[in-house]
């Protein structure tokens, strides 16, 4: 947009320079002689005329209306009008007539397929209405530059300044006084420059300016030529210089509207040009009586000539106020309709396509197709070009045969309908689809909405999808005999495709099978038969339908709907939800409250193009619009169905609501429901209607369905791109959350495995501890038994010692048996000694045993001390887990 505005400004600047160059080149030649021959006392006529007009606005408007013309914009306060005689009226009418004749002459035809030259276009637009050559005019100005300098020196003399000052002071509100009061910075030289310009201003320049304003006012209705008061005050407050005067003069003439510029550069716009009134402009009042405060722009000097001054366009009122004018609305609608017929001055057809593709699905679809084509190799592009040529030749042959049908007297109803088709438009589509899609998307949408003629439907589809190529036919022939893993599944699902004839069933199987081999990532998904069947029916052979299917999948983005995970389908469902929320928030919120998701009922709509429900003829009309606008247009049909059934849907509960969405949502377009239809529906009910069931009990109104979807739901690529961004952002956030949850699940699983391992190790240690405790208890019992044996041995030793002492005591007593024979005593003593020795030996052995047992006791005591601490720890663990395995062990230590 900024480039368009800059070009318009440059065009306005060049146009103003052309007018001024023409004026100066015609009048500067005689300027020197006039000034030299004029005495100083006659400079009174050149004095600055006061700004107050002698004719009021009402008088001027009444005079214009008395001649049968529209009242022009107030020029007396805005436009510089030089001094003229009584012949102004005739000159003005002649100039206006010449200008109108030149404007109505169409310029050379523009080839839309070639890139535009901005500089060349601007030059042509400027020269066309005026018949001028800018370079020649500048050369003429350069030749007269010296004369102009001499003229300024003569007028700038002290005598001339005095005369000018006197004359200026004699006026009611002179310009010199105005400049002194307002700015206080104007010099005498500047005042002389202004006075010279007032005299030198040619009559024709002012007339052309006025007439040009009048013509512009009639063509571009609604453009207010009155200056903004704030801008005017700002200009008047500043210092008055030659640059300010030039800028103000240029500002007073409004810029040439874009529509008029385009009309001059296109032969097809003669109707729009003819809309300009052909009546001559009404005569203006004598210019010596009209006040002026500014002079036209002086010829530039030196380097200033290379830099044209910037124009200041008049500020129009707000759009809301201008839309109140019926003429402005009419002109706005004409400009909107013709915006596709004219190539803008930006100089590039691609730039127009890029801007249109942001708001129009047709232009967006063509841009995507072009991008896919540019990515292909040279051989592929040549093959596609050959396919395009073949389709065009096929269409030409069909038209030739069609002309022969016109010669037949007796034709049936179908042939009559065929003759009513706008074959000239479809010929234009076939020959140059790029131009039609780029410049006339609304016209193309209207024709496609009414339906592509069945006789050329396959040709148009292949041209739009750019799918016809010898390369794709060779691929089909090569893969036809290749084995497929999905053969049984394909044959089973094809039995559900009821609108395909038996003789076409095998061909349909081959097409789907070859595609599953051609694209192994997609393979085969249930629902492909509904997509491939209409293609096969409208193509000449299987190879063409295969190429068209590949084009839909690859170029139109249908492949993403059938990939594993169906990312494209999820995106379309999200876009459907957002569009439904935008068009009917109440219905969307109702579905959310009931827990109804679009995945429950809308997936088959997008996967089968509604073919699972509607008859073949109905589906073909949907395919027509899909090929021209893309699969995004399915969102229009889906949202339209929901909006038409909104009143019923908001009243149902979950179960009934889900059943209605699956089975009864399409009943709105049954022919039997026309009693409740609107006026538009009744008007379309006379169109095509197709049966919904084989028994013919129901029939659908396809024209009404398509018309409602295309006019009732407005979708732009910009909106879909915004929804795509939202979906990607949400999906990325969900993916990050899912990744985080997955990492937590993995970490949790690892921790669980560690816990299980620790529990296993703990069970092993627990078993070892239990065995050690049991062994400790057994040792404790053994120790107690040894202590008992020790005590018994000690008691035995004590008894033996007492016996020995008793025996010794007895021996020390007087032997009453001394009288006994010595031999007996000796033997008894020996026996006693030997017995004593034996007892001593046994006693030594017992003491050694006691020593050993004491050592064992000490060792067991040490072990017992160590085990006591271990037992206390185990006892606390057993209490924590509710186990009572150490109760007996504690009793032992007590």
Swiss-Prot record:
What SUPFAM superfamilies does its record include? Answer: Ypt/Rab-GAP domain of gyp1p (SSF47923)
Q: Where is the composition biased (Basic and acidic residues)?
A: 1-23, 134-164
Which PANTHER family does the record match to this protein? GTPASE ACTIVATING PROTEIN AND CENTROSOME-ASSOCIATED, ISOFORM B (PTHR47219:SF9), RAB GTPASE-ACTIVATING PROTEIN 1-LIKE (PTHR47219)
Q: Could you provide one GO biological process annotation from this protein's UniProt record? A: protein transport
Domain of life according to the entry: Eukaryota
| Record-given protein name | GTPase-activating protein GYP5
Positions of post-translational Phosphothreonine modification: 89
Q: Biased composition, Polar residues: where in the chain?
A: 184-200, 268-279
- Kindly state which keywords UniProt assigns to this record, in alphabetical order: Coiled coil, Cytoplasm, ER-Golgi transport, Exocytosis, GTPase activation, Phosphoprotein, Protein transport, Transport
Which source organism? Saccharomyces cerevisiae (strain ATCC 204508 / S288c)
Q: Member of which family?
A: Belongs to the GYP5 family.
Q: Name one GO cellular component term.
A: plasma membrane
Q: How does it assemble?
A: Interacts with GYL1 and RVS167; and is part of SEC4-containing complexes.
UniProt subcellular location? Cytoplasm; Bud; Bud neck
Which Pfam families would you find in this protein's record?
RabGap-TBC_2
What is the gene called? GYP5
Which residues does this entry mark as bearing Phosphoserine? Answer: 25, 30, 389
């Amino acid at each position: 947009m900024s480039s368009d505005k800059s070009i318009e400004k440059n065009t306005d600047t060049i146009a103003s320079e052309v007018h001024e160059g023409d004026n100066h080149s015609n009048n500067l030649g005689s300027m020197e002689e006039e000034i030299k021959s004029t005495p100083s006392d006659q400079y009174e006529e050149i004095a600055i005329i006061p700004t107050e007009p002698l004719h009021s606005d009402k008088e001027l408007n009444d005079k214009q209306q008395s001649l049968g013309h529209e009242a022009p914009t107030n020029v007396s306060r805005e436009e510089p009008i030089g001094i003229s005689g009584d012949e102004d009226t005739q000159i003005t009418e002649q100039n206006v007539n010449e200008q109108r004749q030149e404007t109505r002459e169409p310029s050379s035809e523009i080839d839309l397929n070639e890139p535009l030259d901005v500089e060349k276009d601007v030059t042509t637009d400027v020269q066309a209405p005026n018949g001028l050559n800018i370079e020649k005019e500048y050369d003429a100005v350069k030749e007269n530059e010296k004369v102009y300098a001499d003229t300024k020196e003569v007028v700038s003399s002290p005598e001339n300044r005095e005369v000018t000052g006197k004359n200026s002071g004699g006026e009611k509100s002179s310009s010199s006084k105005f400049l002194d009061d307002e700015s206080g910075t104007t010099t005498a030289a500047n005042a002389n420059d202004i006075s010279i310009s007032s005299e030198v201003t040619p009559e024709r320049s002012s007339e052309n300016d006025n007439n040009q304003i009048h013509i512009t006012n009639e063509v571009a209705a609604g453009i207010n030529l009155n200056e903004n008061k704030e801008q005017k005050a700002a200009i008047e407050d500043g210092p008055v210089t030659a640059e300010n005067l030039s800028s103000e003069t240029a500002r007073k003439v409004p810029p040439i509207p874009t529509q008029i510029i385009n009309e001059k550069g296109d032969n097809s716009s003669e109707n729009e040009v003819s809309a300009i009134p052909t009546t001559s402009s009404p005569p203006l009042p004598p210019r010596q009586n009209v006040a002026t405060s500014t002079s036209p722009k002086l010829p530039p000097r030196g380097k200033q000539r290379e830099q044209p001054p910037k124009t200041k366009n008049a500020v129009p009122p707000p759009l809301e106020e201008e839309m109140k004018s019926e003429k402005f609305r009419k002109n706005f609608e004409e400009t909107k309709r013709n915006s596709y017929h004219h190539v803008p001055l930006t100089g590039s057809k691609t730039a127009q396509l890029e801007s249109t593709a942001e708001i129009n699905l047709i232009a967006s679809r063509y841009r995507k197709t072009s991008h896919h084509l540019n990515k292909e190799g040279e051989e592929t592009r040549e093959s596609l070009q050959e396919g395009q040529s073949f389709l065009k030749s096929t269409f030409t042959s069909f038209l030739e045969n069609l002309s022969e049908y016109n010669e037949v007297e007796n034709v049936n109803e179908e042939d009559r309908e065929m003759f009513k088709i706008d074959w000239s438009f479809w010929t234009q589509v076939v020959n140059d689809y790029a131009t039609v899609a780029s410049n006339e998307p609304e016209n193309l949408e209207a024709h496609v909405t009414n339906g592509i003629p069945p006789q050329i439907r396959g040709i148009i589809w292949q041209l739009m999808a750019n799918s016809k190529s010898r390369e794709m036919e060779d691929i089909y022939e090569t893969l036809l005999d290749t084995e497929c893993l999905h053969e049984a599944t394909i044959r089973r699902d094809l039995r559900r495709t009821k609108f395909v004839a038996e003789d076409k069933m095998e061909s349909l199987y081959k097409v789907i099978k070859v595609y599953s081999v051609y694209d192994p990532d997609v393979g085969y998904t249930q629902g492909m038969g509904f997509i491939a069947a209409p293609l096969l029916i409208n193509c000449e052979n299987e190879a063409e339908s295969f190429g068209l299917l590949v084009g839909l999948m690859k170029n139109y983005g249908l492949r993403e709907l059938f990939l594993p995970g169906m990312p494209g389908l999820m995106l379309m469902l999200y876009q459907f939800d957002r569009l439904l929320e935008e068009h009917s928030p109440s219905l969307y919120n109702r579905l959310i409250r009931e827990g109804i998701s679009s995945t429950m009922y809308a997936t088959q709509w997008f996967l089968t193009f509604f073919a699972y429900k509607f008859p073949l003829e109905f589906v073909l009309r949907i395919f027509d619009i899909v090929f021209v606008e893309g699969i995004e247009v399915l969102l229009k049909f889906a949202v339209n169905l929901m909006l038409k059934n909104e009143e019923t849907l908001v009243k149902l509960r979950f179960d009934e609501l889900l059943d209605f969405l699956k089975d009864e949502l399409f009943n709105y377009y049954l022919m039997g429901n026309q009693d409740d239809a609107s006026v538009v529906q009744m008007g379309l009910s006379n169109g095509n209607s197709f049966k919904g069931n084989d028994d013919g009990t129901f029939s659908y109104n396809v024209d009404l369905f398509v018309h409602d979807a295309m006019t009732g739901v407005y979708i732009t690529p910009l909106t879909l791109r915004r929804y795509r961004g939202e979906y990607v952002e949400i999906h990325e956030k969900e993916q990050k959350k899912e990744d985080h949850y997955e990492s937590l699940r993995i970490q949790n699983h690892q921790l669980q495995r560690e816990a299980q391992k620790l529990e296993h190790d703990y069970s092993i240690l627990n078993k070892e501890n239990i065995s050690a405790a049991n062994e400790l208890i057994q040792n404790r019992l053994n120790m107690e038994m040894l202590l008992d044996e020790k005590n018994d041995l000690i008691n035995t030793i004590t008894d033996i010692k007492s016996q020995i002492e008793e025996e010794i005591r007895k021996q020390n007593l007087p032997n009453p048996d001394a009288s006994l024979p010595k031999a007996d005593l000796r033997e008894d003593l020996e026996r006693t000694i030997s017995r004593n020795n034996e007892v001593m030996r046994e006693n030594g052995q017992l003491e050694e045993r006691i020593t050993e047992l004491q050592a064992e006791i000490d060792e067991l005591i040490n072990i017992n001390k160590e085990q006591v601490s271990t037992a206390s720890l185990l006892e606390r663990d057993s209490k924590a887990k509710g186990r009572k395995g150490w109760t007996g062990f504690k009793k032992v230590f007590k």
